[in-house]
Each structure stands twice: as structure tokens, then as C-alpha cells.
Amino acid sequence: MIERTFVGENVSETLIDEYFKTKLVRAGYSHIDFKKTPIGTRITVFAEKPGFVIGRKGKMVKELTETLATEYSVKNPQIEVKQVENPDLDPAVVGHKIASSLERGMHFRKTAHSAIRRVMGSGAKGVAIIVSGKLSGERSRTEKFMDGYMKHCGEPAEALVNKSHQLAKLKLGIVGVTVKIMRPDVSLPDEIVISSGEIKEVSEISEVSQE
């Protein structure tokens, strides 16, 4: 019974997270933090632009609160809004900006290079950006852009690397954008890095469209 309740809560949080992603696009939405209290549920929303989450005269935050209570059955939801400390070190915010740029017609390579420079300029130990889909033709492919130090597997990758996945809707189809950032404050025992400042690129053809 406890396990079923735990799974149900996780599913609910995932659905709410997806709802906020869609609803708070202009706010530079990052993530949410749930905490149950004796009088209800406190939900902390982290975003690049808190003002857009609150809305004019609190209109948006009231709408979000009502939706959580009526459509997601959250008991007495209380929304708190916090600003992301450094948007260029937040993979969700970085990924959203990349996706938005792609939707506006910016070239994926230029967009990724620009994002990597901002991330590394903010002090990140390393960054990886993976863009997958029909980027410039009928062939779907995967482009990877990396700089600095990055753990790709094992416990360090899970504990020290922040990740996010966003979607960009282009004329050719849906393009996935994955961002991985190694935070500035991490300390690794095997770290010996001499960074040249050169962004590495890897291109892979993943499938061929039959259309």
C-alpha cells in the first residue's frame, strides 16, 4: 500500500512538472520541489523569471493553484516562487533557450556553440549538448557538442551531473535537446583537466526517413 502511494505521488509530480513546462514557457521554468505540510502541499517553483510565474496582480499563480487543486487533486496547494540563481548553469533553462532558438529558425550548431560558451563562462566544470532529429534534411541524426570535463556513466554521472531534456517543434519534425552540466562546485578525485576551450562535435546519422 505504501509503495503504491509512493508511485502515485511520483506520477502526479511528473504530470505537474510537464504541465508547468508547458504553462510557464515565458518564465524560463526550471523545476519544482514538493513538500507536504500539516496544512497542505507546498510547491516551490524555480524559474528564471519569477514575475511571469506570479503574473499581473498574482493572476497566474492563482490560476496555477486552482489547476493543481481541481485537475491534479493536490491538497491545499501553496505555491512559492524562487528565482534560479544562475540560469546558465541550469540545464532546463539552457535547454529551453536552445529549443526556442531552433523554433525561431536559428541554426542548431550556432545555437549550441553559443549555449556552451555561456555555460562554461559561468564556471561549469563541463557541458554536453545533444541535439537529435531532422536538423537540416530528411535524415534524422544526432549532433553532440561538448566542452570541459564530463562523466557519462556510473555513480558520479548520476550524482554530479545535472540533466534536462526539452523538445523543439520544427517544420521537419520534433527535435530533442538534451543538456548535461557538471556543476562548478563538484570535486572529483580523478580530475586532471587541461581545457583548450575548443568545443568538440560528434555527428551521427540515427535513421533515414522513408518519406
Curated annotation (Swiss-Prot):
Keywords: Ribonucleoprotein, Ribosomal protein, RNA-binding, rRNA-binding. One of its GO terms (biological process) is translation. Gene3D superfamilies: 3.30.300.20, Ribosomal protein S3, C-terminal domain. InterPro entries: KH_dom, KH_dom-like_a/b, KH_dom_type_2, KH_sf_prok-type, Ribosomal_S3_C_sf, Ribosomal_uS3_arc, Ribosomal_uS3_C, Ribosomal_uS3_CS. Residues 16-85 form the KH type-2 domain. Pfam families: KH_2, Ribosomal_S3_C. GO terms for molecular function: rRNA binding; structural constituent of ribosome. GO terms for cellular component: cytosolic small ribosomal subunit. Belongs to the universal ribosomal protein uS3 family. Binds the lower part of the 30S subunit head. Part of the 30S ribosomal subunit. HAMAP family: Ribosomal_uS3_A. This is Small ribosomal subunit protein uS3. It comes from Methanococcus maripaludis (strain DSM 14266 / JCM 13030 / NBRC 101832 / S2 / LL).
